[in-house]
Amino acid sequence: MSSPAPDALLGPADIRELAAALGVRPTKQRGQNFVIDANTVRRIVRTAGVRPDDVVVEVGPGLGSLTLALLEAADRVIAVEIDDVLAGALPATIAARMPERAERFALVHSDAMHVRELPGPPPTALVANLPYNVAVPVLLHMLDTFPSIERTLVMVQAEVADRLAADPGSRVYGVPSVKANWHAEVKRAGSIGRNVFWPAPNVDSGLVSLVRRTEPIKTTASKTEVFAVVDAAFAQRRKTLRAALAGWAGSAAAAEAALVAAGVSPQARGESLTVEEFARIAENRGADHADDANN
């Protein structure tokens, strides 16, 4: 595999020139902020641990800054882009700046939330600068839809990064934390300043690393059943679980029965529970009826 030219990556002038030629202005509606620093995208690829045999899927490639850096390191890159103009221009950018890798690139012109299959071999890694406004749903959808993804590194708003990587008991621990942890071991992997983006966002960004669990959570409950408990628990996060889960269980008494059967205090709150504990609660829905039947 030959090495790309040293100037193959996009710099600030390249980004603005490309955008001007395409008539592109980053939009808040789609949470677009383009990375304009080559050192930053190489750092992302390095932090992601991209290997020469990896098939990497990237969501929201934009003008191609990170895409080109991924192509330097991976076997194949599949980019998912919703924007008509950006999707139309990206293959030409790859061909012009990294022609020796162009055949290793594939584009999927679609909303990532609607993607159910990808061309070529199954992806082994997800690396993306995710649009701020859809970061968590897109991340969870990709992890759920493509179990072959072993490693993930996403750049998201710093606040979102903190939530994704939060541990039980943290004030920012919530639905994203639990659902991400269902799929993977999650941790913060660094911070990114505002000055490497165009336009510069009003907030800092963070890198989040997710390594797929080698063994799924041991539970007889389905993901849908477990996530229903999680959603109910955090919909009223200041309430005790006995109260917060009353609607889910059918009554406060039924919620208490499920909690006790799961070994969880009815007076606890969702922010103190691990994903395994949520799974046990889901398993024990209807525990009060089971007790009645046994009496």
UniProtKB/Swiss-Prot annotation:
S-adenosyl-L-methionine binds at N33, V35, G60, E81, D111, N129. The keyword Ribonucleoprotein does not apply. HAMAP family: 16SrRNA_methyltr_A. Its main location: cytoplasm. Specifically dimethylates two adjacent adenosines (A1518 and A1519) in the loop of a conserved hairpin near the 3'-end of 16S rRNA in the 30S particle. May play a critical role in biogenesis of 30S subunits. GO terms for molecular function: 16S rRNA (adenine(1518)-N(6)/adenine(1519)-N(6))-dimethyltransferase activity; RNA binding. InterPro entries: KsgA/Erm, rRNA_Ade_diMease-like_C, rRNA_Ade_Mease_Trfase_CS, rRNA_Ade_methylase_Trfase_N, rRNA_adenine_dimethylase, SAM-dependent_MTases_sf. It comes from Streptomyces avermitilis (strain ATCC 31267 / DSM 46492 / JCM 5070 / NBRC 14893 / NCIMB 12804 / NRRL 8165 / MA-4680). It catalyses: adenosine(1518)/adenosine(1519) in 16S rRNA + 4 S-adenosyl-L-methionine = N(6)-dimethyladenosine(1518)/N(6)-dimethyladenosine(1519) in 16S rRNA + 4 S-adenosyl-L-homocysteine + 4 H(+). CDD domains: AdoMet_MTases (cd02440). It holds the Pfam family RrnaAD. One of its GO terms (cellular component) is cytosol. It is an enzyme of class 2 (transferase). This is Ribosomal RNA small subunit methyltransferase A.
